[in-house]
Swiss-Prot record:
The lineage of its organism: Bacteria, Bacillati, Bacillota, Clostridia, Lachnospirales. The gene is rplK. It comes from the Bacteria. Part of the ribosomal stalk of the 50S ribosomal subunit. Interacts with L10 and the large rRNA to form the base of the stalk. L10 forms an elongated spine to which L12 dimers bind in a sequential fashion forming a multimeric L10(L12)X complex. Keywords: Methylation, Ribonucleoprotein, Ribosomal protein, RNA-binding, rRNA-binding. This is Large ribosomal subunit protein uL11. Forms part of the ribosomal stalk which helps the ribosome interact with GTP-bound translation factors. Transmembrane segments: none annotated. One or more lysine residues are methylated. GO terms for molecular function: large ribosomal subunit rRNA binding; structural constituent of ribosome. GO terms for cellular component: cytosolic large ribosomal subunit. InterPro entries: Ribosomal_uL11, Ribosomal_uL11_bac-typ, Ribosomal_uL11_C, Ribosomal_uL11_C_sf, Ribosomal_uL11_N, Ribosomal_uL11_N_sf.
Length: 141
């Protein structure tokens, strides 16, 4: 028989840098999860992903054990990395902060494809391009 699921915890943690400090510690502590064990496993699994922010979904079981699934980094994080900028524009319609090529958009869309609700690469690319435009990043050929 499968273990009884007690809850899910969704967090976004920098790759390889999970610590028992907030927000990780309190979120796991209230479900009775072994915080040190989670941070060790998460850091080992994401150590090769640099400074990207990694979304993680932790499944907590009734016996206080857990499992977790890491997702692909959020699209804005990947766009900022591709454009080498710190943040998007405060006024995306008026002030453009960077440019991104279609090839870079395609690369990001291919990486994000498992987590996107898109049927094809073209629709995934239009989602990523829309995110870029809303950040004040111009999509060029």
């Amino acid at each position: 028989m499968a273990k009884k699921v007690e809850g899910y915890i969704k967090l976004q943690i920098p790759a390889g840098k999970a610590t028992p400090a907030p927000p990780v510690g309190p979120a796991l502590g209230q479900h009775g999860v072994n915080i040190v064990e989670f941070t060790k496993q998460f850091n080992a699994k994401t150590a090769d992903q640099g400074d990207l922010i990694i979304p993680v979904v932790i499944t907590v079981y009734a016996d206080r054990s857990f499992s977790f699934i890491t997702k692909t980094p959020p699209a804005p994080v990947l766009i900022k990395k591709a454009c080498k900028i710190q943040s998007g524009s405060g006024e995306p319609n008026k002030k453009k902060v960077a440019k991104i090529t279609k090839a870079q958009v395609q690369e990001i869309a291919e990486l994000k494809m498992p987590d996107l609700n898109a049927a094809s690469l073209e629709s995934a690319m239009s989602m990523i391009a829309g995110t870029a435009r809303s950040m004040g990043v111009e999509v060029t050929e």
